[in-house]
């Protein structure tokens, strides 16, 4: 259980694996996900490592799998097995390569054949429609005989629409062009040929499919009449430029009919072949879809294992692989078991050897988390990963973070909406996780679902404390205030009530205030009071100061546990104790004055209540001459003077003593080292040269343990100044709890007054319809402004209060994160490089 509050104890071990068993052992460790491999080849180029060829083969397989995925996209549904595939053995890579390369080759061949057949189908379809349209043209537009194109121009004028100036033998060109190019094609043809051609075109009713892009295309059929070889060449060049397809079209009607019949027969045969080819392609895709997910997992696992093996060393005999691993000490038994399973799986007889390695390198920091605590741990780690074995703020953040958020966000109505949203994500988390969404914004909210859940719960709690629900109050227990005694004793009468814009209740009059406060939260009568804001400002401001100082004192107390764990006795005496004295004597005393004033003065004596602010300022100035501000209690001057003096004493206590103690310790250790060297020299009979050598070694050792008093003193001075000034600035920083709570309450009230109350005031049928419309607007604005914008603002401020005001009292955050080799992280794409 101690690991919850402090990072896991880590161990660095050297593992000796037989080359044949290394792959299986690493794969078993990847399934376990509790081992971080140390890169022993950091200075070696990635292309010069031992298993680079295997990694390239895996990348080649990944390329094939991406090709298969692209082919299956929008055509075949990829089947996802219930259980992930096991890590394949090294020898299975050859089988997998053969299978995938064969499938890729067959699919590429099928695609090429299918594309070629589709292209032929497109050309034949275009030719079919061209022959039909050409025949229709000759039948409707001309009365020419079969010898029209052979004889001279004696019958030319029988073509009704051909210009009369065209004489001589006529030729024609027929083809197909994309519809969007038709207008430009016609204009260019007219200009280049200077009007000496006759163009006739018609739109194809059938949509065609591009064999390459598979997009639908619209085309026009055209026929151009011309005279002379030069015009024919010009027309051909223009058609080529506009990517128009020219088809041979017989001059005689019988030949055209015969060609059309032949084209129809070829189209029928082609459709049969295309159907068979598509059926074969679909069978290949079905085979790929059934195994694609398993293949991807196998390849990713193999590639990850070889990447890890590239981080290991191979001994000179090429028979043993040496790896260095970080792992939690508590999981040693599981890791040894995984290595033994890998050895058995590989068929090796050599048991992997683990030997602990002594190192001065700081171990990585590993904090165990579950789906509930992971979000809070991420908040802490976003500021900085904790130093090894220092106390972990995350368990305390689970409570303090949503609570401080709720203090700023406090509204039980808004908290209820937030709670319902979080509950929906929590209750449907399995279904939502299975969808594996790639939307970054959604993933941020979903990963923080338990954080949002607690923020909603705490917001409901603080909302009930504030008695605030969508800016309105609940009157569950009945108010503790009554107006009847004001009439009974004659303070109020009908005339006063009718002529006074404001009436003030006097709690000093018996019966006006019952003496028993509202059982839970703020009395609902304050919702009617004109001085509601004044009362709430005072209440929330003092509450913010109390919560802030308590939060900071808790942070300082946590630093004590760090000092005790790391056995820093000097830090306890010369750092923790003066820090606590400084904090408690000044700011702890401020909290005492606030609570004491609340308890000391009631309705009858409140007029004589002194100002805490003036007392606190006078405490630092030693100014007690203000007779208008009565003391809170007897001997207040002596008590406050004592607190200021011990606070001032704690500053040099923190600043001066520790550097000088460290200096004295260093000088003592140097003296002991020098004495040892002197004794060794006296016992040596090697003469003066030996003394010189010993002296040289002594100087060298002293250099290695260099002690810089100036650096230590400057560091301690910075820490002291930062802490003392930080106590003041951090206390002021907690006033954001008051400011944001006030802003949220006022925005909520404005939204209710300017939107929802309008709908509630509407009368008749208009009110019946209008209230639904206005409520929709109110709901949208509430979610957008108060829940999203205000919620994000309160979240960021709570984040700052934890990162700066709380964690800087005890948290170093200078560690490195434990990044274990885990197939789960590899498959999720969250593995760190």
From Swiss-Prot:
Membrane topology term: Multi-pass membrane protein
Cysteine disulfide partners in this protein: none
Statement: the UniProt record of this protein carries the keyword Transmembrane helix: yes
A UniProt-annotated Pfam family: V_ATPase_I
Location(s), subcellular: Apical cell membrane; Basolateral cell membrane
Principal location class: membrane
Domain of life: Eukaryota
Keyword hit for Transmembrane: yes
Residues in the Vacuolar compartment per record: 410-411, 474-538, 598-642, 746-766
Gene Ontology CC annotation, any one: vacuolar proton-transporting V-type ATPase complex
Tissue expression pattern: Specifically expressed in kidney, but not in the heart, brain, spleen, lung, liver, muscle, or testis. Distribution within the kidney appears more widespread than that seen in man. High intensity staining at the surface of intercalated cells, with additional expression in the proximal tubule.
One of the GO BP terms on file: synaptic vesicle lumen acidification
InterPro entries attached to this UniProt entry: V-ATPase_116kDa_su, V-type_ATPase_116kDa_su_euka
Keywords, comma-separated and alphabetical: Cell membrane, Hydrogen ion transport, Ion transport, Membrane, Transmembrane, Transmembrane helix, Transport
Stretches the record annotates as Disordered: 681-700
GO molecular function annotation: ATPase binding; P-type proton-exporting transporter activity; proton-transporting ATPase activity, rotational mechanism
Transmembrane region(s): 391-409, 412-428, 444-473, 539-558, 577-597, 643-662, 721-745, 767-805
Cytoplasmic side: 1-390, 429-443, 559-576, 663-720, 806-833
Family classification: Belongs to the V-ATPase 116 kDa subunit family.
The protein's assembly and partners: V-ATPase is a heteromultimeric enzyme made up of two complexes: the ATP-hydrolytic V1 complex and the proton translocation V0 complex. The V1 complex consists of three catalytic AB heterodimers that form a heterohexamer, three peripheral stalks each consisting of EG heterodimers, one central rotor including subunits D and F, and the regulatory subunits C and H. The proton translocation complex V0 consists of the proton transport subunit a, a ring of proteolipid subunits c9c'', rotary subunit d, subunits e and f, and the accessory subunits ATP6AP1/Ac45 and ATP6AP2/PRR.
Function: Subunit of the V0 complex of vacuolar(H+)-ATPase (V-ATPase), a multisubunit enzyme composed of a peripheral complex (V1) that hydrolyzes ATP and a membrane integral complex (V0) that translocates protons. V-ATPase is responsible for acidifying and maintaining the pH of intracellular compartments and in some cell types, is targeted to the plasma membrane, where it is responsible for acidifying the extracellular environment. Involved in normal vectorial acid transport into the urine by the kidney.
Protein name: V-type proton ATPase 116 kDa subunit a 4
UniProt source species: Mus musculus (Mouse)
Gene: Atp6v0a4
């Amino acid at each position: 259980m101690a690991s919850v509050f402090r990072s896991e104890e880590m161990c660095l071990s050297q593992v000796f694996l037989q080359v044949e068993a290394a792959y299986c052992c690493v794969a078993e460790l990847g399934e376990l996900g509790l081992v971080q491999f140390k890169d022993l080849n950091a200075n070696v180029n990635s292309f010069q490592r031992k298993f680079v060829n295997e990694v390239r083969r895996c990348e080649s397989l990944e390329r094939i799998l991406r090709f298969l995925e692209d082919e299956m996209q929008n055509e075949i549904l990829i089947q996802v097995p219930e259980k992930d595939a096991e890590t394949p053995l090294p020898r299975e890579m050859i089988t997998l390569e053969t299978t995938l390369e064969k499938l890729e080759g067959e699919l590429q061949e099928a695609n090429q054949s299918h594309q070629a057949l589709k292209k032929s189908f497109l050309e034949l379809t275009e030719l079919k429609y061209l022959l039909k349209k050409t025949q229709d043209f000759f039948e409707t537009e001309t009365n020419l005989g079969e010898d029209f194109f052979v004889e001279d121009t004696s019958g030319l004028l029988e073509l009704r629409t051909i210009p009369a100036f065209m004489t001589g033998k006529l030729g024609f060109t027929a083809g197909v062009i994309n519809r969007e190019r038709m207008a430009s094609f016609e204009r260019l043809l007219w200009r280049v040929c200077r009007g000496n051609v006759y163009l006739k075109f018609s739109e194809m009713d059938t949509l065609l499919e591009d064999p390459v892009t598979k997009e639908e295309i619209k085309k026009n059929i055209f026929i151009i009449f011309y005279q002379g070889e030069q015009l024919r060449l010009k027309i051909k060049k223009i058609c080529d430029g506009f990517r128009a397809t020219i088809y041979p079209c017989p001059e005689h009607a019988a030949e055209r009919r015969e060609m059309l019949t032949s084209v129809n027969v070829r189209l029928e045969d082609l459709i049969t072949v295309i159907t068979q080819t598509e059926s074969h392609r679909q069978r290949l895709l079905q085979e790929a879809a059934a195994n694609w997910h398993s293949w991807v997992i196998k390849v990713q696992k193999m590639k990850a294992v070889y990447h890890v093996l590239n981080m290991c060393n191979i001994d000179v005999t090429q028979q043993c692989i040496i790896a260095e691993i970080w792992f939690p000490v508590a999981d040693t038994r599981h890791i040894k078991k995984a290595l033994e399973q890998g050895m058995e799986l590989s068929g090796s007889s050599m048991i992997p050897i683990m030997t602990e390695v002594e190192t001065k390198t700081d171990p990585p920091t590993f904090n165990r988390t579950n789906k509930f605590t992971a979000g809070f741990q991420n908040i802490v780690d976003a500021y900085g990963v904790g130093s090894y074995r220092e106390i972990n703020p995350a368990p305390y953040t689970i409570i303090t973070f949503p609570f401080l958020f709720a203090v700023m966000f406090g509204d039980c109505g808004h908290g209820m909406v937030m709670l319902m949203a979080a509950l929906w994500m929590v209750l449907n988390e399995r279904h939502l996780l299975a969808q594996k969404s790639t939307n970054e914004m959604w993933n941020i909210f979903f990963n923080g679902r338990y954080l949002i859940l607690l923020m909603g719960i705490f917001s409901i709690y603080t909302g009930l404390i504030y008695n605030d629900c969508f800016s309105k109050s609940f009157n569950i227990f009945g108010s503790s205030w009554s107006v009847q005694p004001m009439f009974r004793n004659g303070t109020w009468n009908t005339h006063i009530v009718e002529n006074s814009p404001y009436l003030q209740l006097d709690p000093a009059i018996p019966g006006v205030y019952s003496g028993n406060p509202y059982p839970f939260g703020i009395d609902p009568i304050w919702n009617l009071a004109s001085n509601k804001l004044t009362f709430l400002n005072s209440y929330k401001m003092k509450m913010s100061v109390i919560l802030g100082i308590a939060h900071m004192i808790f942070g300082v107390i946590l630093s004590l546990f760090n000092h005790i764990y790391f056995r820093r006795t000097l830090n306890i005496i010369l750092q923790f104790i003066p820090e606590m004295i400084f904090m408690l004597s000044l700011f702890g005393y401020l909290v005492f004055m606030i609570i004491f004033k609340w308890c000391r003065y009631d309705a009858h004596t409140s007029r004589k209540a002194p100002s805490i602010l003036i007392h606190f300022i006078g405490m630092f100035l030693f100014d007690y001459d203000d007779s208008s501000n009565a003391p809170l209690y007897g001997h207040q001057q002596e008590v406050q003077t004592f607190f200021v003096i011990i606070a001032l004493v704690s500053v040099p206590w923190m600043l001066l003593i520790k550097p000088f103690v460290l200096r004295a310790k260093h000088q003592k250790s140097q003296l002991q080292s020098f004495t040892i060297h002197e004794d060794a020299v006296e016992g040596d009979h090697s003469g003066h040269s030996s003394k010189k050598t010993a002296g040289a070694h002594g100087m060298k050792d002293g250099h290695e343990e260099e002690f810089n008093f100036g650096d230590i003193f400057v560091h301690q001075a910075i820490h002291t100044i930062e802490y003392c000034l930080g106590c003041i600035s951090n206390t002021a920083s907690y006033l954001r709890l008051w400011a944001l709570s006030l802003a949220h309450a006022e925005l909520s009230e404005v939204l209710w007054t300017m939107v929802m109350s309008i709908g509630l005031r509407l009368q008749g049928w208009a009110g019946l319809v209008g209230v639904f419309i206005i409520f929709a607007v109110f709901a949208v604005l509430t979610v957008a402004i108060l829940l999203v914008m205000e919620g994000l603002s309160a979240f960021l401020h709570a984040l700052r209060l934890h990162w700066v005001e709380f964690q800087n009292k005890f948290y170093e955050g200078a560690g490195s994160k434990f990044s274990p080799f885990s197939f789960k992280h590899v498959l999720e794409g969250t593995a760190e490089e």
